Structures are given as structure tokens and as C-alpha cells.
Amino acid sequence: MPARAAGAGVELSRLSAFKPDLYHRAWSSIPHPTLPLIATAHEKSVTVFSLSTLSAHSNLTGGHTRSVRCAVWKPNLPSGKLCLVTASFDSTAGLWRWEGDVPLEEGTKKGESTEIDVTRRRNNNDSDKDNDDDWEFTLVLEGHENEIKSAAFSPSGQYLATCSRDKSIWIWEDVGANEGDDEWETVAVLTEHDGDVKCVAWCPDVPGRNISSYSPDVLASASYDDTIRIWREDGDGEWACVAVLEGHSSTVWGVQWEPKVDNTKFPRLISWSADKTIRVWTLEQDDPEASLSQPGAVQSPFKSGLGGIPNTMRRTLKEEWRCSAVLPSVHTRDIYSASWSKNGRVASTGSDGSILVYEECAPSNPSTTPADLEEGDSNVIVKPGEAKWKVLGKVSDGHGPYEINHITWCSRYDAGVEQRGVEEMLVTTGDDGIVQAWQLKESIEL
């Protein structure tokens, strides 16, 4: 039964699993940012599924000698173009481009489906070779010494970050004159973490990211050393760690930025850990900076972010981040994955096989503090009036006895939804090789 909070909650029910079953451990499933496609990493390959039919669209095989840990979509490509980067345990990242002639029809109205004709691409008689003919493996990125655990594109697609068991983060830049030239250069190798780097995530291109005090490209990383680090580019091509976020007591498996914020606040960050907690992190922004938006304000030549700081001063520059919330502790083992939806809800899953959905709600009294914080947790600093979190729903043993490795929110395009591309669903990926879609229904206790 789903958990309830404050008389309301959500019920999670299974939609159809994506077909075909993969029959081997699957690591993650990443939705395309604008199209009804989702890429699942498993074994030495990637299966791209259609979100319209919940069936396979195409396969990417033959590029790696060991398991593919994740696959990420390059954003902002011209219509009809697809590009994926795969991160593998063979210590390389591969770049793939779709060279097929499948028609892509962009929706023109809010909620209108973005269609992809997948019926021509796959039927029960197709061979794997037929299904990957239209994906071209165009480039191998080499440099890491051990398994690559995660990869992520910056919002513009100019930068790609990869991280590895070798404790390093590599930042690659697309320096090709035209899209498809596939010319990439290493612009930074970051080695400050003391353990495996499990995850990298770029701050999304939301209004709050572009406050004048900050450089636009911001990267977060999570590590086996129990910390999160924040990285920025200084305007001269140098990348620096500007903050170390401490509070978790075990491996930090991942981080994700808040996908939708108002115009004045820098996006928050969530992290999840082997310590069975999910934490929310907030950047402490200087009030004087906010005053610069007032008429007649004068911009100081020395910003509180990296831009504008002389080289001799950059080493001492630090940002102040605080843990502003800990979500209710329900998981009984490692939390492997969490996802923040565009409507503000958070979903999580992990080693215990449970799926949790949380929601943030403002306290009734602005002077109160959240009641769901870990007792005696001195790392949590809550300011008056900040919201608390509650559990909206729970499913136990979502993939039976198997661990669930990944969870993500994505838009629904299947035939069972009225507003295609508007309503969200959850997708979980597990050790059983199943990619499972979940529907959320609002419920109210009378």
C-alpha cells in the first residue's frame, strides 16, 4: 500500500514493462530531453526504447568491450539528428550518431505528442544487426584509467563531463566547426576527490543559474569519499572546485539539480547515499548581490562568483553551501538513484527494492523548522520558513527480489494518457533486466 501524508498521497501502479526484456542487469535509463525516446544501458550495449509504444526503437552494439554504465543524449541538436555518449567499464566513452531516415515530427502545441515512427524499425523478425545499422559509432574518448561510472552533457552541449573509479573527472569540449565534426578536446582533469567518483551532473539552464555573479556552467560531482564537490569555470578556461559539501556518512551515489526554479534563486541540489539518506543543498547567496538588480546599482569589478576575480585571488574563492533538508528516512539500504521532477516531487530507489515518492510542503508557521530532519544532525542548517518534505507514496519490492539501479521521471507519450508529453511517469531499471514504467494517481483520504 502507498504511504500517505497529511491526508493525501499517490498510488503507484505498474504500466507495461518496456519490451523486449533485456534478461541481464540493466544500469540506467535516460530520457531524451525533447523526444519520446529513452536509452537503457545494459551489458555492452544500449537499447533505445520508444516512449510512445514502450517497445525497442534501436540498439547500439559493438563499441565497448565491457558493460556500458550509462548513456546520455547530446542536447540542442537540429531536427532529425540524434547523438548519444556511452560510458563504459572498459574506461572509454563512445560517441554515437543516428544516421537513419526515421521521420521525426516535432509537436507544435503544448501537450502535443512528438512522434517517432518506430513500427518500421522493429518487429519480432528483426535481427540485432538490423536494429543497429542506423547508429554509427563515430568517436572513442580515452584517458581514464578505470571504469567510467557516469557522463553528462552541459546544457548547451559544448561540454561533456565523465567520471571514473580512478578518482578523476574529465571535462571534454566540442571544438568542431560544425555539428557532426566530432572533434573533442580535453579541457580539464579534476583530481580532488579522494575516492571513486560515482556521478557528475551539470546545473540545468534555468533562470536562476544566470545570476551575474556566477559563471554559467556549473558541475557537481559525487564520490565514494562521502562528499559532493561543486566546480566552476573561471572565464579563462580553468576549472576550480569552489565548494565541498559534507554531511553524508557513506558513499554518495549520485546528485541531481533542481530542474525548475524561480528567477531569483540558484538551483538547489539533491544527493543520495549509502547512508540511506537524501539531502537537499542550498547555495548561500549574498544579499548585496541581489541589490544590484535595483535601479542605479553599480556592479563591483570583483564578483562573488569566479568571473571577474584576478588570478591571484582565485585560489581563496569559496562558495558557501548548506544542507537545508534531509528527506524522511524510509529506505533500509543504499539509495542508488533519485530523480527530481519538473513539478517538484522527488522519487528514489535502491538496494532495498523500494520506490519512494516525496513532496515538499511549506510549514504552516513560517518560524518553524522541518520535523523530519535527522535528530542530532548538526550538518543540517534550516532557516525559518523553509519547507519540509513528506512521503507521498511507496512501493516495496518494485522489481521483486532484485535491486533497482535507477529511477527517472519522464513525460508520457503512450496511448493510455490524455495529454501526451505533459503527464509524467516513473521508469525504473533493475538487476532483473526489466525497464518498468509506473503511473502515479493522486489519492485523498476522507
Curated annotation (Swiss-Prot):
Annotated S-S bridges: none
Any Gene Ontology CC annotation: cytosolic [4Fe-4S] assembly targeting complex
A Pfam family that the UniProt record links to this protein: WD40
UniProt keyword annotation of Repeat present: yes
InterPro entries to which the protein is assigned, alphabetical: CIAO1/Cia1, G-protein_beta_WD-40_rep, WD40/YVTN_repeat-like_dom_sf, WD40_repeat_dom_sf, WD40_rpt
Gene3D superfamilies assigned to the protein according to its UniProt record, in alphabetical order: YVTN repeat-like/Quinoprotein amine dehydrogenase (2.130.10.10)
Protein's UniProt keywords contain Repeat: yes
Keywords, comma-separated and alphabetical: Repeat, WD repeat
Residue ranges, annotated region (Disordered): 106-133
Domain of life: Eukaryota
GO biological process, one term: iron-sulfur cluster assembly
WD repeats: from-to residues: 17-59, 63-106, 143-182, 192-241, 247-291, 330-368, 398-446
Composition-biased stretches (Basic and acidic residues): 106-128
Stretches assigned to coiled coil: none
PANTHER family: CYTOSOLIC IRON-SULFUR PROTEIN ASSEMBLY PROTEIN CIAO1-RELATED (PTHR19920:SF0), WD40 PROTEIN CIAO1 (PTHR19920)
Family: Belongs to the WD repeat CIA1 family.
Protein name per UniProt: Probable cytosolic iron-sulfur protein assembly protein 1
Native source organism of the sequence: Pyricularia oryzae (strain 70-15 / ATCC MYA-4617 / FGSC 8958)
Encoding gene (name): CIA1
